[in-house]
């Protein structure tokens, strides 16, 4: 076949994928919806809509339902997505463990397990992770219907297009082809993504930023990072990586960061840094509800909520530095909403006003007006970001078309 012929076939396949995705997205977002409404909103020919919906029904991805006509006449036939028969596994790979969750296509959690993964090399970690997923599948075989995808999210530098991991903060990796290893073992479509960016996408699909197309999520945990949603999509840079706001310098004379710089946001607004700051003050003799032998982010937030002055001052201090950095991001991206995630949000009544105060003095007035700063709604759902990657692949047609063809 000539290159021109191959290109023509490729273009036809792409058009099929885009058209199927357009129909599925409308049903997912607005269902119950009629075929006529789908044709009007998608601007596809009614015959094309009929053909695509027939294929989706035959595959079991959508179903017809009766809907009472508004005129009180004959019931109209509408369409909704079918989510119960298709399952995906989402994995949140942490520094020492993995949370593995079974989802249906509505994002409902059907099962969840935590597996310790103390391995410290790329090879042993891959072996242990794949075995943990296999064990999870075996444990929940009775609940599992059609497994359509496995998705893994993790901290580090991830190339989602190649499915390779180039850096992780706790073990040395070298072009780790995790997607290839997963697909070879489990024979399903697999995805890999960055944990914070994937959480930002999950908030857009299912959580605090469902009502807007442009948002920034900032998460404080072992480090500090951001996920940026622009026009409803994850904003990514070269090799799929962007949003390392934890390494913006906020204190030029501050402590040395593990990146080699001094005074990065992460040296102030990370769980360990917050705990160490409170611990140092306690050792200096400052009074607090926080016990010296239990100085954790959880007890610090709890004390701040009860009005403890030391805990509140530290949370406010962290909030001001977060606000300073977020103001820079606001001036760059002009989002419609800011979402804050991490254990520190347990003290949101202290934290969020401190962030907002800084934004109100350092972000452009036109950008900060009517800009909500809210707490994450999904931070407690470890693997929801992994499922968001599966959801995206259904909505953009990549996984959807694969299901239609197989």
UniProtKB/Swiss-Prot annotation:
Induction description: By N-acetylglucosamine.
DNA-binding interval(s): 35-44
Transmembrane segments: none
Keyword DNA repair: no
Gene3D superfamilies: 3.30.420.40, Winged helix-like DNA-binding domain superfamily/Winged helix DNA-binding domain
UniProt keyword Acetylation, yes or no: no
Disruption phenotype: A double deletion with priB is disadvantageous to cells.
Domain of life: Bacteria
Cited InterPro entries: ATPase_NBD, HTH_MarR-typ, ROK, ROK_cs, WH-like_DNA-bd_sf, WH_DNA-bd_sf
Gene Ontology MF terms: DNA binding; DNA-binding transcription factor activity
Single biological process term from Gene Ontology: regulation of DNA-templated transcription
Range of residues in the leader sequence: none
UniProt KW keywords: Activator, Carbohydrate metabolism, DNA-binding, Repressor, Transcription, Transcription regulation
Similarity comment: family membership: Belongs to the ROK (NagC/XylR) family.
Role this protein plays: Acts as a repressor of the nagEBACD operon and acts both as an activator and a repressor for the transcription of the glmSU operon. Genetic interactions among priB, dam, lexA, nagC, polA, rdgB, rdgB, rep and uup link the PriA-PriB replication restart pathway to DNA double-strand break repair.
Protein name: DNA-binding transcriptional dual regulator NagC
Species whose genome carries this gene: Escherichia coli (strain K12)
